[in-house]
Every structure is written in C-alpha cells, then in structure tokens.
Amino acid sequence: MGQKVNPHGLRVGVIKEWNAKWYANSKNFSSYLVQDNKIRKFVKNKLSSAGVSRIEIERAAKRVKLNIHTAKPGMVIGKGGQGIEALKKDLVNFVDKENVLINIVEVKNSDANAQLMAENIAQQLERRISFRRAMKQTIQRAMRTGAKGVKTACAGRLAGAEIARTEQYHEGTIPLQTLRADIDYGFAEADTTYGKIGVKVWVYNGEILPTKKIEKKEEANA
C-alpha cells in the first residue's frame, strides 16, 4: 500500500500537517475548497520562476492567510515589498474576505525538496535533455545535501517512444510503509512534443520519533 498511496496523505495526523487549516459548515465547505484550488493554481502560475514548493492556506473570520514556501523569497517579495502587494491585490479577486495576509517561508535546501526536484526534472525534459541524465543528476545533488534516500520515476512516451513506459531510479533507502519515516513527495508534469510525461520524486529525510510518548514514559518512571 505504501508504494501506491500519496506519502503526505498517509502521514497526515501522524507526522505531517494539513496544507489547508480551516473549518467550515456544509454550506461553505465546497466554495472554500474551490477557492483554495484556484488560489494554489494562480500562485503557482504567477510565481512559476520562484520555486514554490508548498502553499498553506489558513482561514479565520475575516481574513485569509497564505504561507508560501519558496526557494527564492526575494523574487516573491520584490523591491520594497511591491511583489507581495501586487499578489495581495490579485488574490482579493479569488476570496470574499476583507484581509489577505501573505507569509513567505524560505526553502533552505531546494536540492532536497521533492516538489522542486520534480519540477526541475520536468523542465529538463521539456528542454529535450535525456530523462536518465536528468533523474540521475537530481538524485546525486539530493544525496550530497544529506538526504538518506531518493527515488524518482518518469512515466510517458520517454524519448519519443511509440509505447509509453515508466522508468525509475533510486539511491539509498525509502521506507514508504513506515509512518514515522519523514518522506517528502513531489509530482510534476512535463509538456513535450510527444505528450505529457509525469514525474514523481520521493525523498527520505530520516525518522521523526514520537517525542510526546517518550516524555510521558520518563515522567512515569520518575
């Protein structure tokens, strides 16, 4: 099962958190969900060159807060915060709240971020670089930065082949079944002249141990 399911969804509530943090009644839930989808698509398209890996959306009574995780925060913020202000004005069209707050979070290690790695491979495929070379170089860079394991997969008409297939490469360990394993997952699509090629990346960053349970046991022993 661990090989098929989205690693983030499998670990939500265990070691991962939701990308959308809000509550709604049955009347507003569907409209909020559609708004979230539109916001994510718009921000990803507008900031496509800024390396946006993740967008968290929080909602309160009269405000919407966005936490944008990006590898190039300076490009998003702009001179004197002009980029942020322009983005706020655009986002007001998508939400019916009075305030839109934007918080920029820097992705410090972009070479080991699964989403950015997948997008990087997809961009190379669109430039007609060999998929084997693109995947192997991306894996090597991630392993050099301290990742414990990396797995990449490309699916589609690779190198213009008549029959679509899936090619995978991996290095290190990727324990997808272990819930305490910190697995980062990313997906991107490359639009080539032969059709779309799907790119998936899994990055293993070590285990996250349940610290709360350990603390309780220590207190009981004392």
UniProtKB/Swiss-Prot annotation:
Pfam families: KH_2, Ribosomal_S3_C. One of its GO terms (molecular function) is structural constituent of ribosome. InterPro entries: KH_dom, KH_dom-like_a/b, KH_dom_type_2, KH_sf_prok-type, Ribosomal_S3_C_sf, Ribosomal_uS3_bac-typ, Ribosomal_uS3_C, Ribosomal_uS3_CS. Signal peptide: none annotated. Keywords: Ribonucleoprotein, Ribosomal protein, RNA-binding, rRNA-binding. Residues 39-108 form the KH type-2 domain. One of its GO terms (cellular component) is cytosolic small ribosomal subunit. GO terms for biological process: translation. Belongs to the universal ribosomal protein uS3 family. Binds the lower part of the 30S subunit head. Binds mRNA in the 70S ribosome, positioning it for translation. Part of the 30S ribosomal subunit. Forms a tight complex with proteins S10 and S14. This is Small ribosomal subunit protein uS3. It comes from Clostridium acetobutylicum (strain ATCC 824 / DSM 792 / JCM 1419 / IAM 19013 / LMG 5710 / NBRC 13948 / NRRL B-527 / VKM B-1787 / 2291 / W).
